Swiss-Prot record:
Gene Ontology MF terms in the entry: rRNA binding; structural constituent of ribosome
Pfam families for the chain: Ribosom_S12_S23
Family: Belongs to the universal ribosomal protein uS12 family.
Underlying gene: rps12-A
SUPFAM superfamilies with a match to the protein in the record: Nucleic acid-binding proteins
Gene3D superfamilies: Nucleic acid-binding proteins
Function description: With S4 and S5 plays an important role in translational accuracy. Located at the interface of the 30S and 50S subunits.
NCBIfam families: rpsL_bact (TIGR00981)
The name this protein goes by in its record: Small ribosomal subunit protein uS12cz/uS12cy
Keywords: Chloroplast, Plastid, Ribonucleoprotein, Ribosomal protein, RNA-binding, rRNA-binding
Biological process terms in GO annotation: translation
């Protein structure tokens, strides 16, 4: 507990909240261009080949973004929309690619949770 004299000398600093997605620069989404599309393996208890893309954003940042859903059409130079949201078992992956916008097509034959994967309503 500081004394009154200490508080006069140096005031209390407000707690600054640190953003979890700095590359978006406070925007809900950002557009970017894929520089590399590849797979990586998750952390210890899990095992898979997770699809990710290295994306150069319009804000100038180069980030790693997760490609959700089964199957994708992304390749180098694809233009994608990126949103925040980390993948818990992939260290360093703090962004998701939005499916069904720009060059990223929606997931084929998706019945449930379609809005999250850019899938149209089946006829």
């Amino acid at each position: 507990m500081p004394t009154m004299k200490q508080l006069i000398r140096k005031t209390r600093q407000p707690i600054r909240n640190v953003t979890k997605s700095p590359a978006l620069r406070g925007c809900p989404q950002r557009r970017g261009t894929c520089t590399r599309v590849y797979t990586i393996t998750p952390k210890k208890p899990n095992s898979a080949l997770r699809k990710v893309a290295r994306v150069r954003l319009t804000s100038g940042f180069e980030i790693t973004a997760y490609i959700p859903g089964i199957g994708h059409n992304l390749q180098e130079h694809s233009v994608v929309l990126v949103r925040g949201g980390r993948v818990k078992d992939l260290p360093g992956v703090r962004y998701h690619i939005v499916r069904g916008t720009l060059d990223a097509v929606g997931v084929k034959d998706r019945q449930q949770g379609r809005s999250k994967y850019g899938a149209k309503k089946p006829k």
